């Protein structure tokens, strides 16, 4: 009798345990999980969507793209703090007045999924999409990429969490994203700047910058007001910390002549060897053309995505990475464009045609970007992005960039580097064989980018 009673008791315990483990409505998977225990795949999925939209978004480069990345990363970070006990909100530091309360016991991948879906729709809903020939593409097709990705991921998460838990997580992600969107649109210069990309005339005097490409309004530069966009970490003092560029001078012994001549020589070397390393470098890092590739700042997001996957960062670490690199790239655009229009340095093609070779042209790309030269945007973005990435993987991290390995319309063969700083240096230098920058632009971008990354890392992230 005692044996039978004991067996009956064990059978009941077994059945109860089996029922509870199989009952999906009672599944609390994720409710007690911190972000550290989860994988980062939700970020990879959304980065790929962003890169596809960014590639075809007209007048979304170079400023609006990193600005969007900053708010996307910030929103996901703020929404996920309930699963990141070592980190704190930046609400008061940034001046966000109506941030929802931190919530715990949510399924964090769905929180991030909902946040990205809401904000990405908001940032791209008024954008015109064009192919590389300038033909307007269906906006709805691109917005559907967002809708479909959100649905796809939520359906996937039903294998891990109950419907109630997913709905609560989605609601919180959207609530935080809505607050971040209100914060975004309160920036009068940055909000919807892509709808008026040539806002004010630029009055060139002497040998200051003048437009050199056919798409630029005759007396206006692209995003000439971007230096007034809201910043996340960089101060006004930081904006003015960049040293003055070398002054315009026709003397063949002047520094600016030597720098222009270097660009002239390096560009012609690339032109003479269309399959050589100089040309490969120039094409590989260009990312200038809408419809061809994603934008130069988004390139650093793509590199971050590759590193996060290769190193298998957990969800908390990845969340922090994208919050920080987004802010750094956004502030990099502000400090760079502030100084571009502060100094109005003419492009090398203008100086070279006037002082060195009137027949000089830009190889491969065929045009110079429609804004002043100093400092270089590519350089600033590269060093800002790398400055953040080094905080996660160190200064001696070897890296191979596969961003364009499938391309056949230009040389996208992967390039390998001994460190991320080497990558940033090559990205910056690549603008010389392309013929669009001086070496001082590269150096100025180095200074601005590293300073920007340092300021973002100094924000009070940790409790």
Label every PLM stretch briefly.
Residues 18-21:
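C-terminal motif of bacterial Sec signal peptides marking the signal peptidase cleavage site
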């Amino acid at each position: 009798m005692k044996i039978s009673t004991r067996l009956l008791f064990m059978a009941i315990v077994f059945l109860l345990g089996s029922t509870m483990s199989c009952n999906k409505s009672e599944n609390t998977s994720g409710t007690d999980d911190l972000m550290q225990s989860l994988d980062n795949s939700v970020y990879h999925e959304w980065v790929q969507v962003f890169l596809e939209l960014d590639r075809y978004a007209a007048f979304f480069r170079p400023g609006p793209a990193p600005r969007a990345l900053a708010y996307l990363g910030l929103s996901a970070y703020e929404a996920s703090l309930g699963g990141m006990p070592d980190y704190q909100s930046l609400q008061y530091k940034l001046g966000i007045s109506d941030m929802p309360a931190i919530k715990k016991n949510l399924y964090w991948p769905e929180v991030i999924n909902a946040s990205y879906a809401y904000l990405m729709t908001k940032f791209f809903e008024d954008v015109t999409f064009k192919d590389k020939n300038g033909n307007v593409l269906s906006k709805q097709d691109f917005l559907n990429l967002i809708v479909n990705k959100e649905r796809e991921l939520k359906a996937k998460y039903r294998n891990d969490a109950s419907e109630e838990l997913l709905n609560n997580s989605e609601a919180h992600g959207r609530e935080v994203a809505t607050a971040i969107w209100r914060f975004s649109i309160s920036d009068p210069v940055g909000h919807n700047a892509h709808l008026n990309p040539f806002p004010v005339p630029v009055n060139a005097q002497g040998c200051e910058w003048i437009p050199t490409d056919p798409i630029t309004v005759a007396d206006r530069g692209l995003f000439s007001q971007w230096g007034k966009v809201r910043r996340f970490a960089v101060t006004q003092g930081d904006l003015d910390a960049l040293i003055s560029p070398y002054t315009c001078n026709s003397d063949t012994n002047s520094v600016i002549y030597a720098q222009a001549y270097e660009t002239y020589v390096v560009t012609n070397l690339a032109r003479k060897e269309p399959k050589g390393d100089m040309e490969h470098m120039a094409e590989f890092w260009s990312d200038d053309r809408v419809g061809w590739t994603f934008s130069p700042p988004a390139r650093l997001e793509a590199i971050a995505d590759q590193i996060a996957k290769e190193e298998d960062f957990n969800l908390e670490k990845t969340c922090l990475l994208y919050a920080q690199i987004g802010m750094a790239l956004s502030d990099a655009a502000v400090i760079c464009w502030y100084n571009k229009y502060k100094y109005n340095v003419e492009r090398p093609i203008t100086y070279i045609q006037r002082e060195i070779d009137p027949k000089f042209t830009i190889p491969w790309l065929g045009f110079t970007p429609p804004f002043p030269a100093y400092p270089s945007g590519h350089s600033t973005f590269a060093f800002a992005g790398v400055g953040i990435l080094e905080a996660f993987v160190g200064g001696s991290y070897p890296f191979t960039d596969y961003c364009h390995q499938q391309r056949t319309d230009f040389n996208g063969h992967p390039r390998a580097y001994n460190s991320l700083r080497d990558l940033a240096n090559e990205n910056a230098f690549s603008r010389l064989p392309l013929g669009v920058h001086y070496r001082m632009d590269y150096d100025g971008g180095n200074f601005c980018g590293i300073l920007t990354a340092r300021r973002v890392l100094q924000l009070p992230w940790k409790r």
